[in-house]
């Protein structure tokens, strides 16, 4: 199934983070913090401005992004994979090589 976000929404696949501390202790899933990085897998058509124009989003599919710890509270499962849906304004930065 394909997910197509509306307007200024973005769908992000959360990056897998190491669940081991610097000292080598493996953390159980409940104790590990969820990563605040991910890859954009789908973007909406853009933000609708007050005058009716649509402004394209600054992020694109494939971008690696950083978001806040409480961003993307709308987690959904698609084909067994958990994806985050958030507004573009919740994305803090794009990671570049």
Curated annotation (Swiss-Prot):
One of its GO terms (molecular function) is protein-folding chaperone binding. GO terms for biological process: chaperone cofactor-dependent protein refolding. PROSITE patterns: CHAPERONINS_CPN10 (PS00681). It comes from the Bacteria. SUPFAM superfamilies: GroES-like. One of its GO terms (cellular component) is cytoplasm. InterPro entries: Chaperonin_GroES (IPR020818), Chaperonin_GroES_sf (IPR037124), Chaprnonin_Cpn10_CS (IPR018369), GroES-like_sf (IPR011032). SMART domains: Cpn10 (SM00883). It is found in: Cytoplasm. Keywords: Chaperone, Cytoplasm. Heptamer of 7 subunits arranged in a ring. Interacts with the chaperonin GroEL. Together with the chaperonin GroEL, plays an essential role in assisting protein folding. The GroEL-GroES system forms a nano-cage that allows encapsulation of the non-native substrate proteins and provides a physical environment optimized to promote and accelerate protein folding. GroES binds to the apical surface of the GroEL ring, thereby capping the opening of the GroEL channel. Belongs to the GroES chaperonin family. This is Co-chaperonin GroES.
């Amino acid at each position: 199934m394909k997910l197509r976000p509306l307007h200024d929404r973005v769908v992000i696949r959360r990056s897998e983070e190491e669940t081991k501390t610097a000292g080598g202790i493996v953390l159980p899933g409940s104790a590990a913090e969820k990563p605040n990085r991910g890859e954009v897998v789908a973007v909406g058509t853009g933000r609708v401005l007050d005058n009716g124009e649509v402004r394209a989003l600054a992020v694109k599919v494939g971008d690696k992004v950083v978001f806040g710890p409480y961003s993307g509270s709308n987690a959904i499962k698609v084909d067994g994979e958990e994806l985050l849906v958030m507004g573009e304004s919740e994305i803090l930065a794009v990671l570049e090589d």
